[in-house]
Amino acid sequence: MKNTYSYHLYTAPYSQCHVEFVTENNANERDKLVLIRFYSYNTLEIEIVQATDGYWYPVVRAYVAYSRTTGKQVNRFTTELYGESKYYQFKECEIDNCRSDMVLSDDVIQRFYNYYRRGGKRFY
């Protein structure tokens, strides 16, 4: 069974964007993270998916430079996730393509997920 947890960005709690964590419950495990989504307004901008090699890859789902506000939100999200802004790298991406040079380890993703689960402001 899949569960979805949505949170406002820590660095922009009142802006119209949110992070969504999708988990899956298995019989042996509980709440295994399978997908991260970033939304600006109601538009899915970026998905972070786990590949078969165990690493997590970002996939651009919409043009991140659509507006100045969306650009700022993507900048804040990537700064939270990577520790630095990756806005320009995402801006150069084609839609539905992943960036192999922006791979993330499972430890980084789990730390990001736990950070939100412990103290994030829920998005309803």
Regions found by a protein language model. Name each.
Residues 1-124:
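Terminal leader/tail segments of proteins
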